[in-house]
Amino acid sequence: MKKVLFAVGCAGLFLGSAAFADEAAKPYVGYWAVNLNGGAGWMGIEQADCGALSGSILWGGGSPLKYEKVNVENGALVLTRTLTSKKDGKEEKKTEKITAKADSGQLAMTKVVVEQDGKETGKSEYKGNKIKPLPAKPDLAKVKFGEPIKLFEKGLDGWVAMNPKAFNGWSMKDGILSNRVLDENGKNKHGTNLRTVATTFEDFNLKTEACMAKGGNSGIYLRGIYEIQMADTFGKGVDCHNMGALYGRVTPLVAAEKAAGEWQTVDITLCDRHVTVILNGKKIIDNQPAVGVTGGAITCDEFVPGPIYLQGDHTNVDYRNMVLTPIIK
């Protein structure tokens, strides 16, 4: 007989099943770093007090996707969500199914699409590992800093294109790092991202100024894995995809952005997997946990040093006065 724990609402679980629910789900609850065979992924599984499960997965880019059903079946974690598309004018629904098996903190994951006739297609396999629990929120008043590093002091000599085959719209003039990827008709040339030559940054404070183009979209990746969104979102409400957000993870407390074309001050602190962001003098993220990498990360490993990288494949953007001050541990 199959033993199945379904992620239903708490009201749908009997008290007698709670102990089994906790035991069956225990190996999976928490955060997982997922290697997407060259890309950086993440999975988060949470369990309510009643035992009900919920889960989301980051598939390399964008934001984590929430799954409609999460259950444990014969010791394996199963997540499903409905995929809706149109074919010949008719709505067609398929099911994306993820099956994962945990063993001593390691994860073997299989992804398939279940067609309407029940046939499984598009099989892919991935590996992952359990992420260490988040440390306590750091007391930033007690943090010690080293000597500041002016990241633009050597011009472009301190930076390298991340995709040498892509269009490179980055240039440096009068201390301003500019990215120009739109032609005279506004068409995107699909430029390259840019990163520091140095890849040894750990925890730090990063200060810079950014000037967003109308409708602009860029990002500052801390250690190459956590994106602080840079975007023209002036006049919009707070959202985890707007200016200053930890992309797809943490929504700003207030909307503090300026209009496109204005220089904006950005002050970011990354310490013990917690992020603080001060935008234009207003604290919009206050020492909040980074529970996992964000879309576009260069690795799913949150415990290795990395570079600062700037997103350059979307729109035009300017940066100036970028200074990184390392935290001394």
Regions found by a protein language model. Name each.
Residues 7-16:
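Bacterial N-terminal signal peptides
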Residues 17-21:
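Sec/Tat signal peptide C-region and signal peptidase I cleavage site
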Residues 22-329:
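Carbohydrate-interacting regions of secretory-pathway proteins
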Residues 1-4:
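Positively charged n-region of N-terminal signal peptides that target proteins for export
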